[in-house]
Amino acid sequence: MSEQNTPQVREINISQEMRTSFLDYAMSVIVSRALPDVRDGLKPVHRRILYAMNDLGMTSDKPYKKSARIVGEVIGKYHPHGDSAVYESMVRMAQDFNYRYMLVDGHGNFGSVDGDSAAAMRYTEARMSKISMEILRDITKDTIDYQDNYDGSEREPVVMPSRFPNLLVNGAAGIAVGMATNIPPHQLGEIIDGVLAVSENPDITIPELMEVIPGPDFPTAGQILGRSGIRKAYESGRGSITIRAKAEIEQTSSGKERIIVTELPYQVNKAKLIEKIADLVRDKKIEGITDLRDESDRTGMRIVIEIRRDANANVILNNLYKQTALQTSFGINLLALVDGQPKVLTLKQCLEHYLDHQKVVIRRRTAYELRKAEARAHILEGLRVALDHLDAVISLIRNSQTAEIARTGLIEQFSLTEKQAQAILDMRLQRLTGLEREKIEEEYQSLVKLIAELKDILANEYKVLEIIREELTEIKERFNDERRTEIVTSGLETIEDEDLIERENIVVTLTHNGYVKRLPASTYRSQKRGGKGVQGMGTNEDDFVEHLISTSTHDTILFFSNKGKVYRAKGYEIPEYGRTAKGIPIINLLEVEKGEWINAIIPVTEFNAELYLFFTTKHGVSKRTSLSQFANIRNNGLIALSLREDDELMGVRLTDGTKQIIIGTKNGLLIRFPETDVREMGRTAAGVKGITLTDDDVVVGMEILEEESHVLIVTEKGYGKRTPAEEYRTQSRGGKGLKTAKITENNGQLVAVKATKGEEDLMIITASGVLIRMDINDISITGRVTQGVRLIRMAEEEHVATVALVEKNEEDENEEEQEEV
């Protein structure tokens, strides 16, 4: 009767079991699968592949062997996982676009940068690369510890000697449980120089280290933008860098431009990149590309992007950087196993741990060589004794019945050890010649000297460091190459929105009811004075264009409100609409408060500290403030000047500190004074009196007046004139001014005062939205107190709403007759 198994049921808490089992699994993944060792930079699978190849004799000087042979050896002896996982790891070690210095020398199809898979392992062949031999060098000299394999039938290395800093040289990437590592590759010579620097100066700082290790060096080259991300990663162990493809814009023989991409960011799939660009072109997310082709071959990479003749290649390239993998970020996480525990390391710590490992390797190798040398010297000492007493030794051996008796006799008679006695018995007769005796003596003396040197090394830390430096320098001389990845410090680390938008001249309009829009400056065609105009925008009965400026899509536009606050927006941030469209409410663009409206707009190309903003309020108060104080404006605005009760900001102009200012009023008065009469004030200051007003008068315009310019006035009934600047004498700030126009019921009160050089076009917009654009030179030059000429024909109930001077448009219309008044 067979024995029955006694059932044993053990109850356990499921939450405790889940916790324990998952922790065991997590630690197994962390320690035995996903993370590299800081000493050799290898994960277990990579270490096992190299060890198995070395065991099979597949060194760099031997013929290639089938990859399947290697995979079988690895999974059969050391790595209890699937063959595909091992083969994929080996393939990566043989890819020059994945490893900065390949550890496997592959023969056959090992994949491509297009994402093509490697051929099956039964077709490909491999052997160790020359540099991977340095990872295993001295492995037979007791330099490392061994451990049992998964079933206890074999022994495998815990770590490799790694005679160069592989962790930083080839990098590593892996996802464990609750943590991940992503270490970029580096240039071999630079990393070795870093190790040497740490060995010579243990107190070296990260900035000092970065003088010899400027940053990562990727196998696919490319460009790293800026050093701040590199430094942060090196100092803290974590950081992010931006990698950009190397692209150039070249001119074709037909005059068109093309973009040539010759290097890609690390781990970017070329085929998918080209597909993505094609998708963007097809979906019209990027316009201006006429052709896209891959001209890469065995000599190098070359992606050609043909550009339409009227398109801007720089803008298209910036869009490609922004929307495709031509520019990517690489998150650095210097996580590695230190004494079996995962730790985030700084650059210096990585180098220190490697240096400590090499000290152990050199000491263990030296101790091994010392043991070997002492053992050999011990034997030679016995042989020397035998040769010194040759006749007695021969007689003893001849008279001994057995080898055991002879060995015992030698030990007792000549005070030898058992090993020495055995060596004498094993010695061939030819070694009794005089020449052989000299060789034994020479070998013994050299061993005595070697033993002294080895003991000196073990007793002297400095000697160990010297050996490390010498051997690292020798490896650098053999394997060093040129840096591939360029670190760009002069360009932007990130692409700004304006880099994706072509610079173009635009007109920005703002209506009385607060609708803003932009449209190309070319939308408006030039007409002659007295024309009927074209419809400039769609308005209703209670809205009209109040502000109009000529600017650029890349300029910063400052919006000043009636309450003395300033807001900002880029030209391209203002939505573009057609000529007759109203635009969008300003509150959708700026965070203006209730009861606040925009009544001055200034375009700024650069916030130069030598430039000023000159302010004038409705009640004649003026202020001058440096433009640089307005460089940083919050989304909810900034106080531009403090207003007195019932006052409003009327006008703002950009000056250089040396200009003449004119201020015009509704009742036809104008004052001219140097801007230096108004001292420079802080941003929130209230200002000083610019012009003295009567109770029923308000300011309608403030301008900068050049010497050879003219003063332009426009009245509410559409009349206007130009008057030479010299007719307005300079007064002191705060005066009442001079009469500048004859005000009648026919022409109405002043609505605008402008300064012109005769190089502009004049835009007039009525309250109903009718717009006319005319050459400023078509307006008559008359005296200071004249009434002027009709500039625009309007219905009886119409009036001029706003006036602006814009860049001249050369397109002309037929002249219409001038009507003098």
From Swiss-Prot:
GO biological process, one term: DNA-templated DNA replication
GO molecular function: ATP binding; DNA binding; DNA negative supercoiling activity
Domain Topo IIA-type catalytic: 35-500
Record's keyword annotation contains Isomerase: yes
Compartments where located: Cytoplasm
Pfam families the UniProt entry points to: DNA_gyraseA_C, DNA_topoisoIV
Keyword DNA-binding: yes
Domain of life of the organism encoding this protein: Bacteria
Listed SUPFAM superfamilies: GyrA/ParC C-terminal domain-like, Type II DNA topoisomerase
Active-site feature positions: 123 (o-(5'-phospho-dna)-tyrosine intermediate)
Gene3D superfamilies (alphabetical): 3.30.1360.40, DNA gyrase/topoisomerase IV, subunit A, C-terminal, Topoisomerase II, domain 5, Topoisomerase, domain 3
EC numbers, comma separated: 5.6.2.2
Keywords annotated in UniProt: ATP-binding, Cytoplasm, DNA-binding, Isomerase, Nucleotide-binding, Topoisomerase
InterPro entries linked: GyrA, GyrA/parC_rep, Gyrase/topoIV_suA_C, Topo_IIA-like_dom_sf, Topo_IIA_A/C_ab, Topo_IIA_A_a_sf, Topo_IIA_dom_A, Type_II_DNA_Topoisomerases
Primary location: cytoplasm
Enzyme class: isomerase
CDD domains named among the record's database cross-references: TOP4c
Reactions accelerated catalytically: ATP-dependent breakage, passage and rejoining of double-stranded DNA
Locus of motif GyrA-box: 527-533
Family designation: Belongs to the type II topoisomerase GyrA/ParC subunit family.
Function: A type II topoisomerase that negatively supercoils closed circular double-stranded (ds) DNA in an ATP-dependent manner to modulate DNA topology and maintain chromosomes in an underwound state. Negative supercoiling favors strand separation, and DNA replication, transcription, recombination and repair, all of which involve strand separation. Also able to catalyze the interconversion of other topological isomers of dsDNA rings, including catenanes and knotted rings. Type II topoisomerases break and join 2 DNA strands simultaneously in an ATP-dependent manner.
Quaternary context: Heterotetramer, composed of two GyrA and two GyrB chains. In the heterotetramer, GyrA contains the active site tyrosine that forms a transient covalent intermediate with DNA, while GyrB binds cofactors and catalyzes ATP hydrolysis.
Miscellaneous notes: Few gyrases are as efficient as E.coli at forming negative supercoils. Not all organisms have 2 type II topoisomerases; in organisms with a single type II topoisomerase this enzyme also has to decatenate newly replicated chromosomes.
UniProt protein name: DNA gyrase subunit A
Organism: Bacillus subtilis (strain 168)
